[in-house]
Every structure is written in C-alpha cells, then in structure tokens.
Amino acid sequence: MNSTLFSKVENHSIHYNASENSPLLAFENDDCHLPLAVIFTLALAYGAVIILGVSGNLALIIIILKQKEMRNVTNILIVNLSFSDLLVAVMCLPFTFVYTLMDHWVFGETMCKLNPFVQCVSITVSIFSLVLIAVERHQLIINPRGWRPNNRHAYIGITVIWVLAVASSLPFVIYQILTDEPFQNVSLAAFKDKYVCFDKFPSDSHRLSYTTLLLVLQYFGPLCFIFICYFKIYIRLKRRNNMMDKIRDSKYRSSETKRINIMLLSIVVAFAVCWLPLTIFNTVFDWNHQIIATCNHNLLFLLCHLTAMISTCVNPIFYGFLNKNFQRDLQFFFNFCDFRSRDDDYETIAMSTMHTDVSKTSLKQASPVAFKKISMNDNEKV
C-alpha cells in the first residue's frame, strides 16, 4: 500500500481542490476523490472495528488471566492471539486509515516504521498461535496417550513465535522510509513539507522475494497445516460419535461435540477469510500494480484492509457466542464484580489439558473416560 502512493504521485499531475476544504489529494480527475458518504461510512466501520477489537480482546485477556482455572494451554495461546490483535487495533488501524485517505504521512518517522512492522508481527503471531492450538488439539485427540503440551510448552512456543515474528518483520524497519520525494516537483503550497511513508527495498526482486516469503510463511503454509490437523480431528471425532451412539446420553455428547467442532474451525476459517482479500490485493499489486486503476486503489485497499482488520474482533466474538462461561464472566467484567470461582455455574466440560480434552478455545469435549470422572465430580470446572 505504501509503495503504491509513490508510483501514483510520480505518474499523475496533482492539484488541490480547495473548494472542498479537504486535505485529501486529488489527481487529474475529480473522480479520484472518495465521496464524503463513502469516507464517513468507512470511518464508522473502522471505528467500530477499533472499539470492538480493543474492548473485546482486552476483556478476553483480563477474564482469562483473572481465572486461574482457565490458564491452560489453549487459553494461554488465545491470550497471546488476543494481545497481538489488540496491538494491531491500537497501533495500526487508525494510522493506516488516515494515511490512505490523506495520501501523506503526518505521524512521524517512528510510526512510519512501526506501523507496518507491528502489523507484520501481529499476523505472524496470530497465525502461528493458531498453529500451536491446532498441534495441541491434534495431540489431545489423535494421540491422547502420547506427548501432550503443557503450560510450560505453551510459554516456550509463544516466545519462539514472537522471536520469529520480529525477525521476519525487521525488513519493514530497515527499508521503510519517510520522504518528501514524491512532492519535490509539485509547486503548490498545499503540498509543501508533505511526506509519504513507503518501503524502499534495494530492488524490485528483493521486495518480491520478501513479500512472496511472507505470503507462504504467514498465510498459505500455516493454513494448510492447520486444516490438515483439523481434518484429522474431524475424522476422529466422527468415529467417536459413532461409538457414542451406543452409550447413554449420547445425544448430549453429540450436541456438545457439534458445538466444539464449530469452535475448532471458526477462528481459523474467519482468519483465513478475513485476510484473503488483502492477501490477493497485495499479491496482485506486488507483481503487476498497473492492473489496479489509480483512482480505485485507495478505496479497494481500504475495503480489503478493513476486512482483514475484522479478524481482530474474531476471538471475542466466537469466544463469547460459543462459550457460556465467557458470557457469564463478561457480565461480571462489565459489572465490575470480582472474578470468583463459581463451580455451580460452570458447564461440566473438561477444559484443562490434564483431562484429555477435545476442543479449540474455551470449550473442550472430554473423552468417554473423562465424562465418567466428571459425572463423579459435579464441581469439575471449565
């Protein structure tokens, strides 16, 4: 996105439409202006995503950290995922939106480098957190008697993820620059002391190599691995359902398994769908930016970027809709009440990885053996 502006300004004559009292850049054709109604709608949409992303992920993090009973491998990874989403909602969303509309950077050199860096780090952390969750689910369901990750493994995995994310995102810090070069040949006073922020790699081949690597590392590679894991989980759960048909209360377990299956894939599918438009947009622009009409670029980018940023709201939405325990805790959170252990209120579904559980985020379906243990202890807690 940032490099697009440079080529756009470089190849078009610029004029300032003072009659509209707008700081937005206008090019040869007034059609390049986004209508005020569109800008207002986009601003409302971005504002809603920021509010929901910040409040939802913050509530999710606080609730899980407040409840010691919820500190298991999956929830630790969910907190990590929510933290990266929270970071993007605060550090990237507002700046990218304003920059795309204004077509010049007003937030200084530090934010110029931090904005793409944080976003790149976040998507790497998010996708590999989902990978670790898939690995944990796979081990607990496919190979319950084999190696199973514990909380210590989760913390080690998170550390490795952040190191990998920071390392893979460093080129943005190195090659992202703040410059007035596109405006140097513009004589209008309106563009004096205006700067743009974009990545300037040593060559196009370097940039293409890096962006292609990110495409594989951050999207296609991890998602393929995740879907393979969950496909194997689905097959195993389907076979288990057939066995449960012969067991008492199989109807209850079947409905719980169905809900858990939805939870297993919901966040992953939402992540893949949300990021797909921006991934396609960036790939097309990197390889042949002339395909995208100049006047359509900003609007198209904002729509794709907004769709991707909706992924920052996915965690609290799915967590809340599919987890009654989270809904109860959320009521306590907004009522400023203490987070106390409520054994009688919680669903009797094993959550801890010590119970050979089967699930994705806050809900886990216990094995038949675990169900027997649960029935013997009504105070077992999610």
From Swiss-Prot:
Topology term for the membrane: Multi-pass membrane protein
Subcellular location: Cell membrane
Cross-referenced PROSITE patterns: G_PROTEIN_RECEP_F1_1, G_PROTEIN_RECEP_F1_2
Keyword Glycoprotein included in the entry's annotation: yes
InterPro entries reported for this sequence: GPCR_Rhodpsn, GPCR_Rhodpsn_7TM, NPY1_rcpt, NPY_rcpt
Annotated S-S bridges: 112-197
Lipidation (S-palmitoyl cysteine): 337
Cellular component GO terms held in the UniProt record: plasma membrane
Residues on Extracellular side: 1-33, 97-115, 175-210, 281-298
GO molecular function: neuropeptide Y receptor activity; pancreatic polypeptide receptor activity; peptide YY receptor activity
Chain ranges passing through the membrane: 34-54, 76-96, 116-136, 154-174, 211-231, 260-280, 299-319
Modified residues (Phosphoserine): 367, 375
SUPFAM superfamilies hit by this protein: Family A G protein-coupled receptor-like
Gene3D superfamilies in alphabetical order: Rhodopsin 7-helix transmembrane proteins
UniProt keyword annotations, A-Z: Cell membrane, Disulfide bond, G-protein coupled receptor, Glycoprotein, Lipoprotein, Membrane, Palmitate, Phosphoprotein, Receptor, Transducer, Transmembrane, Transmembrane helix
Cytoplasmic side of membrane: 55-75, 137-153, 232-259, 320-382
Positions bearing carbohydrate: 2, 11, 17
Matches recorded under PANTHER family: NEUROPEPTIDE Y RECEPTOR, NEUROPEPTIDE Y RECEPTOR TYPE 1
Family assignment from sequence similarity: Belongs to the G-protein coupled receptor 1 family.
Function: Receptor for neuropeptide Y and peptide YY.
Name the record gives this protein: Neuropeptide Y receptor type 1
